[in-house]
């Protein structure tokens, strides 16, 4: 699978990932940042691209939650 095909698959999950993040954070800028990090995380997983659409969505949600949790723990440690 070439990079253009991988980018297309990631684009298919972009809005969904942002929606998940926004639902949990309720802040546009932080949601955008968390969604970007989550998509980069799943992009590093070669199995992601050969998984079913449902499997990909589950991985996107898990990555989004991980990124949000990580960002919040980083934020708490700064305070």
Predicted regions and their residues:
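A short, charge-rich alpha-helical start-of-domain segment used by transcription regulators
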Residues: 1-19, 43, 62-73
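Short, charge-rich amphipathic interface segments used for partner binding and complex assembly
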Residues: 55-59
